[in-house]
Amino acid sequence: MHATTVKNKITQRDNYKEIMSVIVVVLLLTLTLIAIFSAIDQLSISEMGRIARDLTHFIINSLQDWK
């Protein structure tokens, strides 16, 4: 009986940790999206195109250096 109770408490704790992890990830993604849309709202379209092009080049160069 005691082993079952301990196992149930461990399972509940693991479930709690998993749920909290999901909540943290969702909050971080939400904040990231808010920041991205705020930046897009403040910049003009031409600036966003230049930033996207520069970011793409940076990512491609980083991936090539990583190999």
Swiss-Prot record:
It is a single-pass type II membrane protein. The chain crosses the membrane at residues 19-39. GO terms for cellular component: plasma membrane. Residues 40-65 are periplasmic. It comes from the Bacteria. Residues 1-18 are cytoplasmic. The keyword Cell wall biogenesis/degradation does not apply. Belongs to the SafA family. Interacts with PhoQ. Connects the signal transduction between the two-component systems EvgS/EvgA and PhoQ/PhoP, by directly interacting with PhoQ and thus activating the PhoQ/PhoP system, in response to acid stress conditions. This is Two-component-system connector protein SafA. It comes from Shigella flexneri. The gene is safA.
